[in-house]
């Protein structure tokens, strides 16, 4: 049997292609209630449903921002929320030409027999949840696997376990009409250099695509959300041009050209770093059969949060900041970013060790 072609095949291919539209990006707004709770205290905002809804409305209704977005990844709570005037967020997105997506994993747990490595939960009942999310308006999904670099990590067991989990998630999504975004995140934590990150990234991505093929996943109806290949957080920094060369080479060696788009995660880079690295990749003159874009959460929202401060009178200012970040990253997908979007706050490091959504 080759790739699975069920009743949603044509829709999956069309939506995966749309997600990868050059000049458009994905906003990751799928932070769990707990993760939002870690960010709100920095701006003295209480972590309650009304404030979470207000932040999401600020983002989703920013004038002029939706044309820069192809999709928004939502937390389950947000999928069913509405704007202040009663319009479902899902409808507001669709009216603006943006595909709603949904985080479907249930977080990570320690993988027995390893040195603190993890596997991702959420396969139980996933088919039923995907069917419900499709009915609610979602058209793509996200599942995050997490690997770390250490003296002997990631272990072959952790790589295999997480690759198979991503593949099982992928085929279940496709059977229920959702484009699976495959996210094998290799954490930036550590003292390793960029060569070590590239080597690990190649092994992880090769294992993922072996598993996706073994599970008959239709690659044309998927998207990849990998880490950018960088030195570890405690290692010496390198230029965006070096990062671009290593990252694109890693993709060339591992990612089939049937995959329409690669939507990088920011992995705790500052907003400006993440944008400059993406821009350098798109300026690189080499074989790139996939659209190179991003699915950023922290790297699109941090400056916006600081401008908002949870206050109604700051919404317009915060939306201006969000629009500037969205526009800047859109330009970076075309290799046309000039730098400076978001002001001084955009250069602040967003790294959180052992980051959990």
From Swiss-Prot:
UniProt site (Necessary for preference for fructose 1,6-bisphosphate over fructose 1-phosphate): 357
Active site per database record: 183, 225
PROSITE patterns: ALDOLASE_CLASS_I
UniProt-annotated binding residues for substrate: 53, 142
GO molecular function: fructose-bisphosphate aldolase activity
E.C. number: 4.1.2.13
Pathway in which the depicted protein is active: Carbohydrate degradation; glycolysis; D-glyceraldehyde 3-phosphate and glycerone phosphate from D-glucose: step 4/4
Keyword hit for Cytoplasm: yes
GO biological process terms held by the UniProt record: fructose 1,6-bisphosphate metabolic process; glycolytic process
Keywords, in A-Z order: Cytoplasm, Glycolysis, Lyase, Schiff base
Localization of this protein: Cytoplasm
Keyword Cytoplasm annotated: yes
SUPFAM superfamilies according to UniProt: Aldolase
Catalysed reactions, as listed in the record: beta-D-fructose 1,6-bisphosphate = D-glyceraldehyde 3-phosphate + dihydroxyacetone phosphate
Top-level EC class as recorded in UniProt: lyase
Any single GO CC term annotated in Swiss-Prot or TrEMBL for this entry: protein-containing complex
Similarity section: Belongs to the class I fructose-bisphosphate aldolase family.
Protein name: Fructose-bisphosphate aldolase, cytoplasmic isozyme
Lineage start: Eukaryota, Viridiplantae, Streptophyta, Embryophyta, Tracheophyta
